[in-house]
Amino acid sequence: MTKPTEDDPKGISRRPAAFSLEQEASREGAHTKTTAETPRRKPQSFDTEIVLTPDEEDPFLNPALTASDAEAAIAAPRRRRFSFGKVALSAFGILVSLAFGLWTDELIRNLFSRADWLGYTALTVLAIGILAVLAIVVRETAGMMRLAAVQTIKAEADAAVVETRPARAKALVQRLCTLLEANPATAKGRATLKAAEDDIIDAPHLIDLAERELLGPLDRSARVLILGASKRVSVVTAVSPRALVDILYVLYESAKLVRAMAELYGGRPGGLGMLKLMRDVLAHLAVTGSIAVGDSIVQQLIGHGLASKLSARLGEGVVNGMMTARIGIAAMDLCRPLSFKALKRPGIGDFVGDLAPNITGR
């Protein structure tokens, strides 16, 4: 036993021990040998071109840029190809126009040869007809341009959302107010936007506010139009004796609904514009798959307890009413000057609860 010390208070001393340093020395020697055998790289110079990306173009700061690029790639329109059918129609149209001109010239000459007052009467009637045709052309052109303006505003709004500066969004909202100024339902919304014009500096928030204030009342009116057309189609289909009557009435109500939807959102299409709009609506239905009446509607009807209560004619009426509602929703998507972002897009399920009780009499 040893006496306790300050380092060892219990008095227990550690025995001497030996440690080998050969392994560590061999490791250091191998590392030195490897370093000596490895040749050193000569100094080199590199030319680097540093490009600074602006904040508004940086995809890490603006994730919406990548999303918009993907959507644009998906929604890119198909490239139009050369059509021999259009060439043939144009050629025959010119030929018919020349034939009509020669026939008119010969008719007027014959009338002048018989009596001067007949010739002048024919010239007056021809002038009135030409002026009427010019007026129709101007009206159709204005309607097409107005429909194009609505689509332009929608495309520019989607592009202005990703920008940090609000100048483009403010100009877009001003154009939207000008487009909808004839509708008294947007007066309150236009006043609200005018009052908050200098308070909002964020472009997405400004466009969302414009959608809620300007298009919110119009969306409610559009829902009333869709529901009314769907109910009328359901009732007429249920009581009509012939299937041909059903088809004709569905076409009539669909065309009437599409025109009303276009006029509600600021577009006033003419005859050609209406044909183009109907074609776009049918194409939209075909792309989204909304034109198919399948198990989804059947499940909705069963969920409302109608499967055991409706007769065959009443069931057809409900299905045709749902089809009319789908056409109205597609027209709403196309005619609306802004895409659905701040407000919820209506679905077919929003109309089943209102349409089915109307058919069952509850």
Curated annotation (Swiss-Prot):
The keyword Transmembrane helix applies. Residues 1-47 are annotated as: Disordered. The keyword Cell inner membrane applies. Residues 1-11 have a biased composition (Basic and acidic residues). Keywords: Cell inner membrane, Cell membrane, Membrane, Transmembrane, Transmembrane helix. The chain crosses the membrane at residues 82-102, 118-138. GO terms for cellular component: plasma membrane. It comes from the Bacteria. It holds the Pfam family DUF697. This is UPF0283 membrane protein Arad_2632. It comes from Rhizobium rhizogenes (strain K84 / ATCC BAA-868) (Agrobacterium radiobacter).
